[in-house]
């Protein structure tokens, strides 16, 4: 009987230790305030990590939580990052641009590089956290020390929001998502200059002069669900975070189809 009691006490102690041990680990750091379009040039502090291939664009499919694909190609060219909550902002931070620089490591160049937010990270390691593509992280290094800097894995950096700049002639592009039909239209927007991100997308079809607000579906994808079928061509009106508006007139043609890409003739300049 005594042996049974001792065994029960031992098991209880082990379970208690497991419970306590399960709560150990790095403390969770609450996110900072959302980053806005206050381009005042002030540098803030953040933690930086990297993911994917050493010289890659991050996500293995060259995409991410914004829904934008082929970020390894120009104009993103692999200079991408996952932003934490106050940077990604539930998708409304998709496409925004930041300068990032590092100084604390001897391998750091101290020169800023510009990255595009195309993905989301959930690691609560700092109020602001950039999980950079391998290429972007290595770009913070002095010439020839890219790999050595990447071996650091995690480091403190400084960052500030900047206006997005694209090559001359680059216009805003719209992608009609797979599975769309006249009652369900989902549109991804990319290559947005200036603020880089969109806070409102509205659609106008051929049957009405009314601008209908679309819902943010996820990432940089906005959708319209309607009982009454929409009829093309469609015009799209975009509102940027700082309140600027542009209209892509009849950007989606009458014979539109899912999984099609349409390049507009407008841009935020």
UniProtKB/Swiss-Prot annotation:
**Does the UniProt entry include the keyword Disulfide bond?**
yes
- GO terms for biological process? plant-type cell wall loosening; plant-type cell wall organization or biogenesis; sexual reproduction
Entry-linked InterPro entries: Expan_Lol_pI, Expansin/allergen_DPBB_dom, Expansin_CBD, Expansin_CBD_sf, LolPI, RlpA-like_DPBB, RlpA-like_sf
Query: Its membrane topology, per UniProt?
Result: Peripheral membrane protein
Q: Which residue intervals define the domain Expansin-like EG45 in the entry?
A: 63-169
Secretion signal, residue range per the UniProt entry? 1-24
Protein localization: Secreted, Cell wall; Membrane
Glycosylation-annotated residues: 34
Domain of life the protein comes from: Eukaryota
Tissue pattern of expression reads: Expressed in anthers and pollen.
Keyword terms, alphabetized: Allergen, Cell wall, Cell wall biogenesis/degradation, Disulfide bond, Glycoprotein, Membrane, Secreted, Signal
Its Gene Ontology cellular component terms are: extracellular region; membrane
Annotated Expansin-like CBD domain ranges read 183-264
**Cysteine pairs bridged by disulfides in the record:** 66-94, 97-164, 102-108
Alphabetical list of PANTHER family matching this protein:
EXPANSIN-B3, EXPANSIN-B9
* Family from the record: Belongs to the expansin family. Expansin B subfamily.
Q: What function does the entry list?
A: May aid fertilization by loosening the cell wall of the stigma and style, thereby facilitating penetration of the pollen tube. Acts selectively on grass cell walls, which are relatively poor in pectins and xyloglucans and rich in glucuronoarabinoxylans and (1-3),(1-4)-beta-D-glucans, when compared with cell walls of other angiosperms, including other monocots.
The name under which this protein is listed is Expansin-B9
- According to its UniProt entry, this protein's organism is Zea mays (Maize)
Gene for this protein?
EXPB9
């Amino acid at each position: 009987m005594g042996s049974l009691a001792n065994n029960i006490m031992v098991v209880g102690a082990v379970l208690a230790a497991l419970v306590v041990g399960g709560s150990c680990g790095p403390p969770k750091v609450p996110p900072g305030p959302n980053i806005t379009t206050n381009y005042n040039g002030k540098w803030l502090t953040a933690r930086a990590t990297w993911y994917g291939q050493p010289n890659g664009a991050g996500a293995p499919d060259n995409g991410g939580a914004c829904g934008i694909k082929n970020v390894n190609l120009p104009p993103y060219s692999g200079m991408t990052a996952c932003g934490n909550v106050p940077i990604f902002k539930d998708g409304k931070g998709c496409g925004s641009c930041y300068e990032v620089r590092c100084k604390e490591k001897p391998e750091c160049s101290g020169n800023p590089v510009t990255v595009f937010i195309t993905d989301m990270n959930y690691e609560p390691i700092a109020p602001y956290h950039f999980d950079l593509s391998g290429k972007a992280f290595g770009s913070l290094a002095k010439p020839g020390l890219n790999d050595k800097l990447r071996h650091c894995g995690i480091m403190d950096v400084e960052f500030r929001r900047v206006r997005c700049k694209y090559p001359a002639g680059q216009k805003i592009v719209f992608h009609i998502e797979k599975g769309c039909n006249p009652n369900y239209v989902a549109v991804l927007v990319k290559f947005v200059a200036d603020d880089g991100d969109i806070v409102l997308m509205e659609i106008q079809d051929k049957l009405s002069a009314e601008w209908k607000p679309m819902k943010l579906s996820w990432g940089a994808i906005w959708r319209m669900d309607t009982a009454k079928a929409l009829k093309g061509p469609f015009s799209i009106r975009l509102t940027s975070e700082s309140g600027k508006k542009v209209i892509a007139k009849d950007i989606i043609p009458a014979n539109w189809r899912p999984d099609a890409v349409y390049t507009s003739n407008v841009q935020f300049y």
